[in-house]
A protein has these predicted regions:
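Short glycine/proline-rich, acidic loop/turn segments that cap or connect secondary-structure elements
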Residues: 259-265, 290-301
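Conserved SxxK-family serine transpeptidase/carboxypeptidase catalytic domain
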Residues: 239-281, 286
Length: 339
């Protein structure tokens, strides 16, 4: 009888152990199927975090991860940040990562930005900072002065590219880190090239922003840059249409008429000699280099080609330029482009 009771007891223990193993195993053996970032927001509730985990990791894997967080009494909802759950991680290890793991870097990629307001909005959509908090700094003269900039030139620090930040980075630290990358770009060789042109890095960026708006053709940017450098050297007004459009603020314009050239603005290079107070867009590194390495030529006039290829006709004389301009205007009229 005792032997029978012992066998039954051992069987129950064995069955219980197997059942426990079958229950526990998925928490250690199931694997996350792809790299996934979990974002934990300030003041996030436990329920909200559970919902986010299930949404990003999948219902089943997410439930198991949330269960392990409860078992571990992790209180991960208090750990504001972005945490990478790598491909192949189990629910248990995913929970431990959310409990103790360090933040992962978040990619911030930007290009084709014109205004500081647009830039601040892009940043706020990717990183955990309010648009207005960053914008307030970038429009503050004292803050800009710390970097040797003004609110008109502060955009030169932010060069379109791919960067990595902690999601929780503060606005001041964000600008500091971007300034670090800016200084890496402006090495001794580039500074020497700018000096040889008689320009500061800010002036190079300002000229490059005009060049970038003048032509989308990267292989033409150096040639356009040299044309403007020739004008600066001979003390001619730049007379760059993009500066007039920037002053007007209407980017739907395709034709610049004589009355628009009278727009009262320090950015209007038809009215004022030299470069405007700052860039008219955030400038690509390749365009900065196009200015610094602009090939020599004697052109001082240019006009869009009448075939609408995006390239320009260049001229050394005003009469040649007028002939180029007439052909282009004739084609505008033929196509019915009035503004």
């Amino acid at each position: 009888m005792k032997r029978r009771i012992l066998i039954i007891s051992l069987s129950i223990v064995a069955i219980a152990s197997i059942a426990a193993a079958l229950f526990i195993a998925p928490f250690f053996l199931n694997k996350n199927e792809k790299d996934t970032i979990i974002y934990i927001y300030p003041d996030m509730t436990e329920v909200a975090l559970e919902d986010s985990i299930k949404a990003r990791l999948g219902e089943d894997f997410g439930k198991k991860t949330s269960f392990m967080l409860k078992v571990l009494d992790a209180k991960a909802y208090n750990r504001t940040g972005a945490y990478l759950i790598p491909n192949g991680l189990s629910p248990y290890k995913a929970a431990r990562k959310l409990q103790y793991g360090g933040q992962t870097g978040v990619k911030f990629i930007f290009n084709n930005v014109r205004f500081v307001d647009n830039f601040a909005e892009r940043v706020s959509k990717r990183l955990l900072m309010e648009k207005d908090d960053l914008l307030t700094l970038l429009k503050d003269s004292a803050f800009c002065a710390k970097y040797g900039k003004t609110p008109q030139t502060i955009s030169t620090i932010f060069q379109p590219d791919s960067y990595e930040f902690y999601w929780t980075v503060k606005p001041e630290d964000f600008v500091d880190r971007m300034y670090h990358f800016y200084n890496k770009f402006w090495n001794e060789e580039r500074l020497a090239k700018a000096k040889a042109l008689g320009l500061t890095p800010d002036e190079v960026a300002t000229l490059a922003s005009i060049v970038e708006d003048e032509t989308a053709k990267r292989d033409e940017r150096g040639k356009v840059a040299r044309l403007y450098l020739n004008r600066i050297k001979t003390r001619m007004k730049l007379q760059a249409d993009p500066t007039v459009i920037y002053a007007i603020g209407d980017y739907s314009i395709r034709r610049v008429y004589s009355y628009t050239l009278k727009t009262d603005s320090p950015y209007n290079t038809y009215l004022h000699f030299g470069l405007p107070p700052g860039p008219i867009r955030f400038v690509e590194k390749s365009t900065l280099d196009a200015v610094l390495n602009a090939p020599s030529h004697n052109y001082i006039y240019m006009c869009a080609k009448e075939n609408f290829s995006g390239y320009h006709n260049f001229a050394t004389s005003y009469s040649e330029h007028k002939a180029n301009a007439r052909r282009y205007q004739k084609e505008l009229n033929r196509r019915g482009i009035k503004r």
